[in-house]
Each structure stands twice: as C-alpha cells, then as structure tokens.
C-alpha cells in the first residue's frame, strides 16, 4: 500500500532550523542594512517605495488589472496612515519666500511643534522629470545630510509628497555674499577673511571626493555670526581614483567658469579640483575690484575673454590692490597645469596674502567676522531680496492610461537627521542578552544528540516517497501552465501590434491637426496682409487728400511701394504653402483611412484571441478545481500522519537547537581568545612606538645643540670680517662724489623736459585758435546751405511725374490682391469639405464602437450561462476522475475542449445559434450527470473499504507511538545530564569574563602610559621652541652688533676725522641740491597739471560746441523742410496741382525719426539698468538728449554720425543674457565707427580686444566657438541652436553677431551669408538701445537700416580722435558698486 503524502516540508527544503547561527547572523546583517541611513534599502527608502507604488498605481485605468486592484485594496489604507504619521509640509508655517529657481523655490518656515526656524527648499517633481539629466538633487541631499562639516549648510529633514520634494535646511540669516558686496566696498582685510573661509569650505568638499563646479558669491551664505557656508551642490561631481572628472558639458555660471570646463563642451571633458580654485580667483577679484575680471555684455564676449585670459586679465589703476593679492589672483587665473592649489590646499594656505595677526587657519571660525548681520528676530529676512508671488498655475502629472512610474525616481529621498525608527531600545538589549545566555547553556547538547539522527533516518525515507508523488503532480501542473503561457504570449504580440498601429494613427492625426493649424495660421497671415494692403490704400488716399493743400515727401510713397512689394511676395509664398498643405492633408487623410482599416482588422483578431483566452481560462479553472479536490483527499489522509510525526519534529528541533547553542558558545570562546591576543599585540606595538618617539626627540635635541654651536663659530668669523670692512670706507667716499655728479646731470635733463612741455603748450594754443577758425567757417557753410534750399525746389517738379507712375502701379497691385482673395475663398471651401469628411469618419467610428460594446455585453451574458452550467458538470466529472486513470480522463477532456472551441467559434457568427447549442449541451450534461451518480454509488463502496484499511493503520501507529514514548524518556534523561554540563560551561564563562576584565585593566593602564608619554613629548617640544627662540635672539643680537658703527682704533685718528668732515659737507650739499630739485619739480609738475587740465577743458568745450552745432544743424534741417513744405503749398495753391504732386526728399519731416529710447547703465554685475534718452535721427546725425529741455537748448548728451553706421539689428537672449527676458524683444543694437561718436563723458568701459588667433575667419566673419543654453535658432538653416543640457556646437560672429551651427563650417556649406560689418574692430563700438514696445523697436530698426551707407566708411587717419579718450575713465579702471557707510565690526 502506498503512503499518503505529508503536508510538511517541500522537496529541497533545508534541514537546518530557521534560528541557527548562520541564519541569525544574516538577519543581523539585514537589520544593519535597514538601520543604516546611507543604505539604499533603509527604513525610509522601503516606506518611500511602498508609498510610490501606491501613488503610481492608484488610477482608474490601472485598477482594471485584478492584481493591481488587489494590491491597492491591501495597502492603500495603511499607506494613507503612514503618510499621516510621516513629516509633511503642513507641519511648517511659511513666513516668506526668500528665493525662486527653475525647479521650485526656497521658503523661510517655522516648525509648528518645536517653533524652530528653517529654510525649506521645494523641488517640483513634474519639472525635474520633464527636463532630462536633472537628478542633481541626490548629490545635494547626500552632501548636506552626511558632510558633518561646519563649512556646509546642514540638512535636517528631507521628505516628499506626490508633487514636491522638500529639503529642510538650516537658515542662514546673513544672506549671500552678493548682497554683502552690493552693500559694502569690500576692503582687502575682509576679502582675505572671506577667501580663506571659501578655501577651507572647498577643501572640505574636495576631501569628500567631490568637485563643486559652481563656486560663486550667490552660493556662499552667511550665518548669524557672519561666517561663511557653501550651498547649492546640484552641480557637484564625484572624482575618480586619479582625482579627475570626465564630463562633456560645460557646467557653471559664465563669469566664474574655468577655461578647461569651457573646453569640455567640445568633448575633452577631463579636469580636476583646480576648476574650483579658478572660481575662487574670480571671486577674490570681484571683491577687491567690484566687477568680475572677464565681464562682457554678451555670453560670447565673456567666453572669448576667459579663453584668452592671458591677455584679457588686467587690474584697474585706481583700485588699491596689494602685490600679494594680485599675485594670488594671477596664480588662480592661469592654466590648470600651473594653477595654485593643483597639488593640494597647503599651497594656498602658505601664500603670503593670508598672513595676518587677527586669525590663523585653525581658529578662523572662532574669530569675529568682519560683518555680523544685525537681526531683529529669528525670522529676520532683510538680507534677502523680496520675491514676487508666483501666480502661475502649477503643472502636475497627467492621469496615465498605463503604468508610468513618475514617483519611482524619488524613492529613498526621505531623510531624518534624528532617526528614531528601529533605534536600540533597552528591551531589545535585554532580549539579546537572554538569548545569548540560552545559547551558552546548550553548548554540550550537540555532542550527545548525534545518536538520535539514526532513529530519524527511517522517517525521512517515508517522507521522500511522499515527495516523489508531489513532484509527479507538480509536473502535470507545469505542463498546463506552459500551454497557458504560450497562449498569453500570442495575445501579447497581437496587442503590441495593435498598439503600434494605434500610435501610428495618433501620429497621423496629430500631423493632420498640425497641418490644419498651419493652414489656419497661413490664412490669418493672409488676412493680416489684406488688412495691410487696405491700410496702405487708405494711407494713399489720405496722401492724395493732403496733396491738395501741401506737397509731401516721396520717400513715404517709396516706403509704401516697398511694403506693397513685400506684401505681394508674402502673399505668393502664402499661396504656395497653402497648396503644399492641401497636398499633405490629402495624403494624411488617405493614411488615416488605411490605418482605420488596419485597426478594424486587428480589433477583429483581438476579439478572436479574447474568445480563445476565455476558453483557456475556463479549462484552467477546471484543472484547478480537480487539483484542489486531489489536495483535499491528500490532506485528509496526511492529517493522521501529521499527528504521529508532530512529536518526531519536536525532537528534531530540540536536537538542532542543541547544535546551534554548542556552535555559538565555541565561536564566542574563539573570539575572546583572539581579542586577548590582539590586545597583547597592541600593547607591545605601543611600547615600541613610545621608545622610538623618545629616541627621535633626543636626536632632534642633539641636532639643535650642534647647530647652536655652529652659529656661534660663524658669528666669530663675522666679527673678523667687520674689521676689514672699515678699511673699505674710504672707497665709499669716492662713490658718493660720483653720485653727486650724476644728480647734477639729472637736474639738467629735467630742465630740458620742462622746456619741451612749454613748447607743447604753445602748440596746443595754436590748435585752439584753429578750432575757432573752423567754427567761423562752419557759420559760412550755413549761409551756403540756405542757398541750396532754393535749388531743391526745382527738384520737386521732377518728383510729381514719378508719383503718377507709382499710382498706376498701385492699381495693378489692387487687382492682384482681389485675385488672391478669390483663391483664398476656394481654399477655405476645400478645407471645410475636408473637415466635414473627418467628422463623418469620427461618427462612423463611434457607431462601430457602440455596436462592438453591445456585442460584448451579449457575449458576456452567454458566457455567464455557460459557466453556470459547466460548474455543475465539472463537480461530477472531478469525482469520476479520482477513481479512473488520469490518461483516459485527459483524452476525454481534450475532445470536450475541442468541441467547446468549435461551439464558441460558431457562437461568434450568430448569437441565436449559440443559445441553441448551449441548450443541447445542457441536455447532454444532464445525461452525463445521471451516469456519474451511478458511478458515485460504486465509489462509496470503495470508500468504506478504504476506511477499514485506515483503522488498521491507526492501530499500527499506536504501537509505534508507545515505542517512541520510551525513546523520549531516555532522551529526557540525557537532557538532564546535558543541563549539568551547561552549568559547568557557565562557570567557565565566568572565569573567562574575569580574564577579560584583567585585560581591560591592562588596556587602561597602557592608555594612561600613552597620555603621560604625550605629555613628555609636549614638554620636549616646548623646550625645542624655547631653544629656537633663544637661537634667533642671539642671531639678531649678533646682526645688530655687526651693523653698529664703532670707532676703529688702528690707523691715524686725524685722517679719519678729516674724511668724516668732508663726508658731512658733501652730504649737506647733496641734501640742498635735492631740496632745490624737488621744489623745481613740484613747481613744473603743477604747471604741467594745470596745462593738461586746461587742454582737457578746451577739448571738452570744443566737443560740446561741435555737438551743439550738430543739434543746430538738425534744427536748421527741420526748419528748411518746413519752409520747403510752405513753398510747395503756395505753388500748389497758385497752380492748382492735382493729386499727383511731388513729395519731399529724404531730409524732410517724414524721414525725421524721434522718440524716447533707453541706454544701458551698469548698476550691478548681474543685471542691466536703463536710462531714458530723447533720440532724434536727422539726415546726417543721431542725437541723444537727456530731456526735451536739453533738446530745446541744443544741449545733446551724445551724437553719432550716420555715415559711420555699420549695422543695426534686433538682439537675442544670448547677446544680452544679463537683461530681463521681457525686455529682449524691445532691445536693438547699433554698430558704428569709433570716430563717428561725440559724447559728454564716458560711462561704459571699452572691452579690450583679444588676439585674432582665437577666431575662425570665413566670408569676412570672425567666428567664436560657443554653446547656447537659451532659446536660439541658426540664422543659416533656421533650426534650433540650443539645448538646456547638451547644446550642439555653435559659432557666433563677433562683428555682426550672426549665429549658426558649426557643422555648416565643417562641411563647407555655402549657406552662410557674408559679414555685413567690414571694419577694424579696434575702431568699432556697439550700442544697445531699449524701445518702449516691440513695434517701436521694429520701426527704429527698419528706419535706421535704410540710413546705413552702402559702402562701409573707411577710417579717417586725419579725423579727430574719439572724445572718449579725452574725458573717459581709462579702459582698465574699475566700476565699483554704490557703497554705503561701512558698519563697525561687532563681536560675534
């Protein structure tokens, strides 16, 4: 008879108990991983994972999946409870927003429970996932959480919700160093302090194996005591073993970025920590000078200066910077191979710039800071800028239709500095100690329990037989599962094909909508153009009406003519694009139809597969029910066996526990022995070290004594040398006489120089007279110009004829416009027709979907009926299968399944036929049921027989139990003996503990000895220091004796006295001569300064006169045009001229352009400031006035020659990256020659010119390689030229500022236009102007472009030099921020 299978262990299960030694150690390791806050699977990470899964799955579309729905039902409530218990944003009161960035904002908050103040940083999850390469928050969190450095801003808590990440940091009320530099003029003493703190802070970051890469004053915050801490570690990067970093993108702020980091954007991204020291050099320069060393208005200008730093780095003459400070800045701002700090921070610390009496490197944080912030309360935010409220809508994740995992990238972000979860409690410690005692007590049990293993072997054989039976059942199950998996994979492949087609369909629909949008856009453009044409017609009619009273200039007509031509050209292009759009729309509609047909086919296939799947699922359910019935029978039979085997299992567990206890006690014994040996080794090592250190100190003392004796011997030698020096004094007297002669010659030279200066002054007087003569000549020219006015009236008659021709052209253009209108109407009709077609298709699609849903509903009803009938039939079949052979049953089942498949396929054709088939099937099932009932009676008979057999088995097992009771009694006796052995072991353990205490006492003695040795060492070091000081004092004393003058005993005393008298006389003469010379020099210097000031004043007066003359010329021009208009009006009224009269010339009112524009002012390094000026453009000059009163008084601020204009263009964000983004559409740039400018005084520093070798010359351009992180397009191919993180290589001309892809140059494409600006850069200037609106900007640009001369102006070698050179602040002078009175230092 075969034994029934047991329900105990599965095959292949380990025989050892779960509480053995190896298992416990694994559990402890696992517990350590969970407790470790740096571990990726710590408690907070696990909770984050569960929370994220629930948030990502809790959507209606995903809940349709049964497994997901079960998961959410199980964990949704507990996760909500966890969220309520964890830290959240509602635990804090927001005081104020103190900062805002691209990913979120920084808030000043107060914790409701503790009332502590923090700075809380919010990062939007949506924004970070939307932008690629934005996992910067991990580095920032880890550095602030685990740095434990006083130079790094600390992170207290990090938590998250479904929309934001939150970082609760310490609040730094002193603000950043940008605020400090804008409020104070930073002296060198302060700069020394803050630079030292930055160096120490960066050294702390570097020691963690990281490079900051964005060191700037914005990221340097001051605490309440005024000391510095670093912040914003989003750009930090881990160094490799060599201390280097590999990165292909330029990271950092333009003004502070190093040349090697800039080069990395080309692909050579290989640099080390030295890039941070470059930024420190820029920061130090900015503190001392008030501006960054490589400042430029454009991004390209800044980058070109950084790359050419050897030539572009210069110090202002008016800035008070010490030699050591300049040396340090130059040492930082050099090539990375020789940069200071490359070999370690000690290089920087030893630099003489940092020598001072107030602090040293070890105690700098304990000393008083230069500026201690004055705080009114703990929430004082006066040192931060006021941030406007963000009223924009916050973007969130859209509701997904499939699993997206938006919360998964943020798992593990949560962090608490005071982590109380799973902390070691006293109860845990007590249980651990009890467990260890128990383990120690059962050491010896293992030896005596080996005999019991023989008794258990018989039982294991029976168990193996049962396991084999289980395996056979499992193989059958696996076969059925494989068949199911094959069907599922087939279905998945079809579904994926369906999804692909749906995607293609969606793409085509999107393209169709895009083309439709473009067509609408083109139609709008067309309407605008028509409106423009109508407005132009209206303007023409107005002009005709005005001509009846007065003649108007022809330039207006020419301008209108040009505009008409442009509109015609635009209309033609619009019509072409509309035709193209029509074609593409037709093609897309065809593709949509094809896709819809494919979609229908796939949906049919999907229906077939779903029916097949349902059949397979039903079969699987039947098989499972059969399996369950088999398992019930098995469990019923095995319950009896389990009762019998329960006691055996208990004995097995006792045996295994005994083994575990034994192994643990042995391990502890070994560990104690090893620890004892280690302590003895440490003791011996300590003794050796102490003896060695004592020997070293003694040797150093002996060396010092030897050196002391040597110095004494040297001093004796020097005394002898001193006596020989006295003899050489007579020779020194002769040298003094020679010096006197040289002084006299110098005096003569100075007098000659003064004569030359007087000659120059006389020449300048002549120049003044010549300038006055020129003014008289200009007045004469004015009279000549009045005569020219009369001649211009003759030209007007010629212009009347031209006007008639333009009117005829206008008529022709109106006809063309009408034809274009007709074509547009046709396009609209066709478009409407296409839209109707699209609507019909969508309706048909909706109807088909409804029909499919109805059919699915009917199918489900039929399937429910089938399942109900099949349930009854399967119950009977399962009872029959238990007694019949499995092979026969499977063949029958296969036949039945095939019949069902055919029936289900027939059901799809017609629902009525399916109902009939199901009825006939039910009749056949009833017949089968009656047969099964007959077979059931036979089974009951067999069941009675089986019960009798089980009773016999019970009797046998009772006998076996009595035998096993006897064995248990014997085992209990052995257990008693084992307990006595355990007691003995406990005594041994106590002895070992006593030994351990002795060892610990020895260790403490050793430590005391070590402390005493350290004290002796300190004493010796003090003695050494005193010896050194005595030595230096002796050397200094000897040097003093050496330099002291003593009368020489030997030789003739009278000769010496005589020579001394002569010497004194010569000294007196020398002094008198020097005094005379200095007086004369002071006198002549005063005269020279007065003359120079007079020249400067005269030149300034000359410039002002020239400027007033220019403004008067423009006034004369305006008056002349008005006079001309009056003459024309009189002529027209007398002659009675028609609408075709002449209009004015280029110099008359219509060509005159005037209005308010703003010029840039450098108030701050970070942003532009603007000053309004009233600007007038005449035929020859562009005049800038401070106000309208200055205009009336003819007192211009600046004048530019129109002949010297090179180029006028609107700017982009990269040209003026310091300006506000809203202002960019209103800014335009003027390029002009240097000599074409007259100005009252200098306000903008001239940028120094770099070497030409850094530029790529092509078609007159001078291209600079760069990268754009702001929105910019290529002006050659009009494709995007920018990317936020990985922009493509680009070029920008430093003359005309055209931007293009570098590939166009590399591939030698001819699409780049030639440079519009041909001039020498050394004589060229550019000027930025801000209009009141974008329309005004366009008007100014279009009008000024027409004024540019066709041939570029040649620089005039005899022309006057730029007035900037006369009255300007020199090129390298500093522009310091507006300062306020320095606050006195306060003790921290």
From Swiss-Prot:
In-chain residues carrying the UniProt-annotated modification Phosphoserine: 1137, 1362, 1374
Residue ranges constituting the RhoBD domain according to the UniProt record: 979-1047
E.C. designation(s): 2.7.11.1
Region Interaction with NPM1: start-end pairs: 373-420
Residues covered by the REM-1 domain: 497-573
Cofactor list: Mg(2+)
Region (RHOA binding): 979-1047
Superkingdom field: Eukaryota
Record-annotated site: Cleavage: 1131-1132
Activity regulation text: Activated by RHOA binding.
Bilayer topology term: Peripheral membrane protein
Residue ranges of domain Protein kinase in the record: 92-354
Tissue-specific expression: Expressed in the brain (at protein level).
Positions of region (Interaction with PPP1R12A): 363-784
GO CC, one annotated term: cytoplasmic ribonucleoprotein granule
Catalytic reaction list: L-seryl-[protein] + ATP = O-phospho-L-seryl-[protein] + ADP + H(+); L-threonyl-[protein] + ATP = O-phospho-L-threonyl-[protein] + ADP + H(+)
GO molecular function list: ATP binding; endopeptidase activator activity; protease binding; protein serine kinase activity; protein serine/threonine kinase activity; Rho-dependent protein serine/threonine kinase activity; RNA binding; small GTPase binding
List of residues that carry Phosphothreonine: 414, 1212
GO process terms (BP): actin cytoskeleton organization; actomyosin structure organization; aortic valve morphogenesis; blood vessel diameter maintenance; cellular response to acetylcholine; cellular response to testosterone stimulus; centrosome duplication; cortical actin cytoskeleton organization
Keyword hit for RNA-binding: no
Disordered: annotated span: 1-27, 1345-1388
Span of zinc fingers (Phorbol-ester/DAG-type): 1260-1315
PANTHER family, alphabetized: MYOTONIC DYSTROPHY S/T KINASE-RELATED (PTHR22988), RHO-ASSOCIATED PROTEIN KINASE 2 (PTHR22988:SF28)
Similarity annotation: Belongs to the protein kinase superfamily. AGC Ser/Thr protein kinase family.
Name of the protein: Rho-associated protein kinase 2
Organism field: Homo sapiens
């Amino acid at each position: 008879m075969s034994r029934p299978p047991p329900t105990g262990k599965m095959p292949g299960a380990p025989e050892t108990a779960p509480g053995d030694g190896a298992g416990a150690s694994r559990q402890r390791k696992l517990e350590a991983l969970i407790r470790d806050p740096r571990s990726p699977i710590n408690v907070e990470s696990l909770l984050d994972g569960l929370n994220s899964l629930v948030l990502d799955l809790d959507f209606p579309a995903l809940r349709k999946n049964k497994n997901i729905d079960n998961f959410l039902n199980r964990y949704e409530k507990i996760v909500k409870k966890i969220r309520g218990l964890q830290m959240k944003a509602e635990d804090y009161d927001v005081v104020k927003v103190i900062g805002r960035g691209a990913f979120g904002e920084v808030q000043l908050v107060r914790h409701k429970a503790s009332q502590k103040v923090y700075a809380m940083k919010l990062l939007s999850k949506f924004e970070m996932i939307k932008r690629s390469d934005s996992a910067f928050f991990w580095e920032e969190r880890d550095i602030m959480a685990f740095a434990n450095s006083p130079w790094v801003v600390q992170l207290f808590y990090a938590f998250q919700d479904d929309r934001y990440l939150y970082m609760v940091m310490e609040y730094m009320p002193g603000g950043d160093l940008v605020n400090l530099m804008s409020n104070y003029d930073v002296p060198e003493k302060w700069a020394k302090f803050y630079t030292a703190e930055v160096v120490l802070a960066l050294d702390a970051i570097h020691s963690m194996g990281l490079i900051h890469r964005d060191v700037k004053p914005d990221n340097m915050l001051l605490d309440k005591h005024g000391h510095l801490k670093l912040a914003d570690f989003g750009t930090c990067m881990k160094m490799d073993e060599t201390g280097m970093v590999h990165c292909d993108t330029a990271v950092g702020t333009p003004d502070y970025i190093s040349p090697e980091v800039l080069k990395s954007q080309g692909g050579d991204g290989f640099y080390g920590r030295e890039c941070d020291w470059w930024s420190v050099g820029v920061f130090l320069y900015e503190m001392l000078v008030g501006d960054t060393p490589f400042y430029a208005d454009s991004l390209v200008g800044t980058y070109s200066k950084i790359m050419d730093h050897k030539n572009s780095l210069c110090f202002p003459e008016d800035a008070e910077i010490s030699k050591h400070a300049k040396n340090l800045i130059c040492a930082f701002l050099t090539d990375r191979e020789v940069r200071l700090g490359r070999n370690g921070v000690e290089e920087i610390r030893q630099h003489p710039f940092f020598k001072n009496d107030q602090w040293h490197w070890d105690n700098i944080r304990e000393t008083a800071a230069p500026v201690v912030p004055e705080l009114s309360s703990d929430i004082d935010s006066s040192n931060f800028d006021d941030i406007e409220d963000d009223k924009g809508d916050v973007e969130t994740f859209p509701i997904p239709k499939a699993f997206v995992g938006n919360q998964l990238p943020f798992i593990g972000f949560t962090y608490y500095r005071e982590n109380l979860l799973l902390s070691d409690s006293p109860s845990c410690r007590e249980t651990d100690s009890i467990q260890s005692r128990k383990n120690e007590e059962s050491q010896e049990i293992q030896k005596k329990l080996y005999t019991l293993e023989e008794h258990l072997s018989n039982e294991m054989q029976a168990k193996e037989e049962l396991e084999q039976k289980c395996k056979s059942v499992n193989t059958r199950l696996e076969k059925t599962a494989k068949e199911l998996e094959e069907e599922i994979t087939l279905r998945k492949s079809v579904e994926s094909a369906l999804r692909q087609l749906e995607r293609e369909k969606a793409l085509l629909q999107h393209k169709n909508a895009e083309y439709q949008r473009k067509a609408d856009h083109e139609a709008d453009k067309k309407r605008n153009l028509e409106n423009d044409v109508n407005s132009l017609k209206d303007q023409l009619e107005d002009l005709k009406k005005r001509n009846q009273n007065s003649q108007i200039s022809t330039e207006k007509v020419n301008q209108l003519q040009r505009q008409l031509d442009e509109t015609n050209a635009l209309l033609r292009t619009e019509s072409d694009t509309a035709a193209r759009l029509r074609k593409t729309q037709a093609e897309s509609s065809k593709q949509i139809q094809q896709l819809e047909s494919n979609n229908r086919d796939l949906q049919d296939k999907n229906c077939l597969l779903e029916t097949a799947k349902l059949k397979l699922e039903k079969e699987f359910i039947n098989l499972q029910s059969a399996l369950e019935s088999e398992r019930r029978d098995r469990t019923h039979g095995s319950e009896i066996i389990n009762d019998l085997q329960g006691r055996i299992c208990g004995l097995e567990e006792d045996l295994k526990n005994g083994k575990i206890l034994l192994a643990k006690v042995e391990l502890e014994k070994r560990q104690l022995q090893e620890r004892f040996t280690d302590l003895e080794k440490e003791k011996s090592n300590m003794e050796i070290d102490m003896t060695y250190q004592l020997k070293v100190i003694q040797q150093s003392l002996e060396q010092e004594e030897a050196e002391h004796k040597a110095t004494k011997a040297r001093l004796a030698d020097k005394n002898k040398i001193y006596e020989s020096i006295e003899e050489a004094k007579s020779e020194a007297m002769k040298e003094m006489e020679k010096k006197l002669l040289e002084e006299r010659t110098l005096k003569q030279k100075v007098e000659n120089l003064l004569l030359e200066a007087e000659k120059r002054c006389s020449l300048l007087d002549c120049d003044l007279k010549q300038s006055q003569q020129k003014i008289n000549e200009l007045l004469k020219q004015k009279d000549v110009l009045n005569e020219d006015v009369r001649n211009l009236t003759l030209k007007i008659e010629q212009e009347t004829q031209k006007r008639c021709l333009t009117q005829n052209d206008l008529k022709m253009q109106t006809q063309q416009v009408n034809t274009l209108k007709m074509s547009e109407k046709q396009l609209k009709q066709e478009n409407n027709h296409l839209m109707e077609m699209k609507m019909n298709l969508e309706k048909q699609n909706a109807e088909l979907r409804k029909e499919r849903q109805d059919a699915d509903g009917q199918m489900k009803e039929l399937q429910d009926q089938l399942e109900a009938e099949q349930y009854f039939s399967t119950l009977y079949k399962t009872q029959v299968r238990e007694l019949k052979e499995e092979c026969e049953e499977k063949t029958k089942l296969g036949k039945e399944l095939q019949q069902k498949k055919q029936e289900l396929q027939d059901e799809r054709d017609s629902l009525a036929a399916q109902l009939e088939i199901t009825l006939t099937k039910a009749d056949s099932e009833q017949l089968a049921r009656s047969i099964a009932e007959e077979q059931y009676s036979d089974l009951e008979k067999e069941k009675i027989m089986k019960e009798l057999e089980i009773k016999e088995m019970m009797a046998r097992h009772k006998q076996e139990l009595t035998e096993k009771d006897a064995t248990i009694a014997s085992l209990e006796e052995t257990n008693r003996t084992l307990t006595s052995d355990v007691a003995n072991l406990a005594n041994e353990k106590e002895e070992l503990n006593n030994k351990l205490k002795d060892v610990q006492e020895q260790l403490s003695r050793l430590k005391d000895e070590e402390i005493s040795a350290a004290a002796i060492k300190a004493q010796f070091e003090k003695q050494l220091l005193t010896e050194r000081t005595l030595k230096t004092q002796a050397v200094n004393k000897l040097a003093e004796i050496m330099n002291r003058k003593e009368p020489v005993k030997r030789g003739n005393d009278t000769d010496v006295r005589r020579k001394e008298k002569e010497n004194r006389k010569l000294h007196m003469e020398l002094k008198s001569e020097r005094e005379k010379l200095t007086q004369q020099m002071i006198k002549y210097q005063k005269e020279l300064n007065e003359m120079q000031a007079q020249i400067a004043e005269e030149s300034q007066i000359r410039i002002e006169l020239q400027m007033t003359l220019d403004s008067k010329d423009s006034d004369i021009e305006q008056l002349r045009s008005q006079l001309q208009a009056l003459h024309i009006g009189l002529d027209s009224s007398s002659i009675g001229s028609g609408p075709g009269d002449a209009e004015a010339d280029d110099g008359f009112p219509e060509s005159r352009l005037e209005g308010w524009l703003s010029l840039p002012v450098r108030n701050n390094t970070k942003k532009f400031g603007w000053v309004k000026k009233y600007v007038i453009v005449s035929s020859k000059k562009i005049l800038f006035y401070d106000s309208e009163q200055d205009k009336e008084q003819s007192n211009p601020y600046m004048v530019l020659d129109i002949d010297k204009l090179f180029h006028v263009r609107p700017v982009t964000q990269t040209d003026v990256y310091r300006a506000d983004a809203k202002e960019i559409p209103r800014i335009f740039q003027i390029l002009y020659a240097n000599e074409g400018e007259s100005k009252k005084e200098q306000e903008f520093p001239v940028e120094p010119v770099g070497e030409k070798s850094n530029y790529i010359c092509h078609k007159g351009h001078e291209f600079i390689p760069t990268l754009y992180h702001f929105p910019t397009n290529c002006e050659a191919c009009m494709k995007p030229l920018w990317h936020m993180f990985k922009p493509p290589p680009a070029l920008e001309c430093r003359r005309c500022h055209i931007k293009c892809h570098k590939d166009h140059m590399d591939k030698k494409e001819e699409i780049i236009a030639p440079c519009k600006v041909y001039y020498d850069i050394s004589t060229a200037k550019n000027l930025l102007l801000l209009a009141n609106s974008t329309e005004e900007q366009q008007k100014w640009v279009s009008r000024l472009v027409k004024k540019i001369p066709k041939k570029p102006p040649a620089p005039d070698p005899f022309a006057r030099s730029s007035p900037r050179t006369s009255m300007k602040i020199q090129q390298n002078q500093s522009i310091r921020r507006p300062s306020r009175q320095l606050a006195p230092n306060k003790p921290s």
